[in-house]
């Protein structure tokens, strides 16, 4: 539906500027969740159009396949399933997206992102699964929190015997999403970048620029 120029030159630029009206006009005048919808389309292209994208979106669509409602509160925005290949193991990628500003981002996103991934890992026991958090602006303390999750246990609040030792959360700003589309990066190229970034020991204030921005 969206070509490369529209995704990078129009939609992603609107995300950066928080121009919600223009985003809705390009997707659907009645669409409440265009951010998640466009990100799903973008990631489908990155994944070389593999998989059941309509299932992965976790959106209710209208007759024109445009979004009406977003994921339920207990579920990630996009849940992408990958079968094992020579490039990566079988895993699930949870994708969370927000246009929250710098003041609200930490409060709004840190808890639900960690909760969605933690619950998924406890339920599936596939520790190769992880989360990408996409946003127009990254608060340094959000980066710090997500990096700390690498070694922080997450417990099932109803059963303390059920927990995971840590989790992998990769934050991405809109500028990097634009770069991914502009240079036609594919998921099999991004996966090792994310894995190396996850295993890095750099402190949070150095980590994003060195491990994500400069690698994409």
What are these regions (language model features)?
Residues 3-216:
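Catalytic core segments in nucleotide and nucleic-acid processing enzymes
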């Amino acid at each position: 539906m969206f070509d490369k120029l529209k995704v990078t030159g129009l939609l992603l630029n609107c995300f950066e500027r928080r121009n919600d009206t223009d985003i809705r006009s390009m997707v659907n005048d009645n669409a409440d969740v265009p951010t998640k919808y466009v990100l799903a389309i973008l990631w489908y292209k990155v994944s070389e159009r593999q998989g059941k994208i309509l299932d992965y979106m976790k959106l209710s669509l209208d007759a024109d396949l445009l979004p009406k409602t977003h994921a339920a509160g207990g579920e990630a925005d996009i849940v992408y399933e990958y079968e094992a290949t020579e490039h990566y193991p079988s895993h699930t990628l949870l994708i969370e997206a927000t246009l929250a500003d710098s003041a609200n981002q930490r409060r709004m996103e840190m808890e639900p992102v960690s909760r969605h991934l933690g619950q998924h890992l406890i339920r599936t026991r596939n520790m190769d699964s992880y989360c990408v958090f996409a946003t127009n602006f990254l608060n340094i303390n959000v980066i710090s929190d997500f990096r700390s999750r690498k070694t922080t246990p997450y417990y099932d609040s109803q059963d303390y015997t059920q927990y995971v030792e840590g989790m992998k959360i990769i934050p991405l700003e809109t500028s990097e999403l634009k770069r991914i589309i502009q240079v036609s990066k594919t998921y099999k190229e991004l996966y090792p970048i994310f894995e190396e970034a996850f295993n890095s020991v750099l402190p949070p204030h150095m980590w994003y620029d060195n491990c994500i921005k400069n690698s994409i």
